[in-house]
Amino acid sequence: MTDRTDKAEYFIIKALENGVNVMGLTRGHDTRFHHTEKLDQGEVMIAQFTEHTSAIKVRGKALIQTSHGEITNE
């Protein structure tokens, strides 16, 4: 059996202002928030998708880096 976590992709979120919210959303028929973090300017969060997390929502100005590239939201 192969462990999925060693193949999971990581991504980086860097807060460009105080109060950036990072929210993890669940998988399944009923998508729900299951985890929230608040970052202040300059703080960095390294995260990955898991069997429970299918999406991430970022509210506030942040730099998001993945293996596919980077984006800054406003």
Curated annotation (Swiss-Prot):
Keywords: RNA-binding, Transcription, Transcription regulation. One of its GO terms (biological process) is regulation of DNA-templated transcription. It comes from the Bacteria. GO terms for molecular function: RNA binding. Pfam families: TrpBP (PF02081). Oligomer of 11 identical subunits arranged in doughnut-like structure. Required for transcription attenuation control in the Trp operon. This trans-acting factor seems to recognize a 10 bases nucleotide sequence in the Trp leader transcript causing transcription termination. Binds the leader RNA only in presence of L-tryptophan. Belongs to the MtrB family. HAMAP family: Trp_attenuator. This is Transcription attenuation protein MtrB.
